Curated annotation (Swiss-Prot):
A biological process term (GO) from this entry: proton transmembrane transport
Pfam families tied to this protein: MNHE
Localization in the cell: Cell membrane
Protein's name according to its UniProt entry: Na(+)/H(+) antiporter subunit E1
Gene from which this protein is expressed: mnhE1
Disulphide bond pairs: none
Lineage: Bacteria, Bacillati, Bacillota, Bacilli, Bacillales
PANTHER family: NA(+)/H(+) ANTIPORTER SUBUNIT E1, NA(+)_H(+) ANTIPORTER SUBUNIT E1
Keyword presence, Secreted: no
Species of provenance: Staphylococcus aureus
Gene Ontology terms for molecular function: antiporter activity; monoatomic cation transmembrane transporter activity
Length: 159
């Protein structure tokens, strides 16, 4: 991915020199030409086409922000209405992720979401230990992590 992105920038800068016009519009045009050229050559360049990876990373950020906003409202409800019966507790989340960086990313995303904290990962890296501010919604929490965060982290890590 990095090789393709650097090549695209080199092509864009080369385009500026060839056209002898150093404007932002001309750079964008050169970048688009470079993008087309890199796409045509992506089978011989290492890694998958970098635009796909960038799209998946942007998708990960958007999904995380949505989950973050939802979790903030859930915690806000608990703070505003202390009469709500929440049951803090611990649970084990079973993950299918294999790469260490994916497990770390998922753990960080879970920890950054208000109301949940990752306590650790098992030695075999198949279980993540989580503390939730409301344990009564464990099934919903597990389903939310599985269908949104873990799914997109897996997509970002695909080759």
């Amino acid at each position: 991915m990095a090789v393709q992105l650097v090549l695209n920038f080199i092509i864009a800068v080369f385009w500026l020199f060839v056209t002898n016009s150093y404007t932002t519009n001309n750079f964008v045009l050169g970048f688009i030409f470079g993008l087309v050229l890199v796409y045509l050559l992506h089978r011989v360049l290492p890694g998958r086409f970098y635009v796909i990876t960038l799209y998946r990373i942007i998708k990960l950020v958007i999904i995380f922000l949505i989950e973050l906003i939802k979790a903030n409202f859930d915690v806000l409800k608990i703070i505003i209405k202390p009469s709500i019966k929440n049951e803090p507790g611990f649970f084990v989340y079973h993950t299918d992720l294999k790469k260490d960086w994916q497990i770390v990313l998922l753990s960080n995303l879970i920890t950054l979401t208000p109301g949940t904290v990752v306590l650790g990962v098992s030695d075999d890296r198949t279980k993540i230990y989580i503390h939730a501010i409301d344990f009564s919604t464990k099934e919903q929490e597990v389903e939310s992590i599985k269908t949104s965060l873990e799914k997109i982290v897996r997509e970002v890590g695909e080759i």
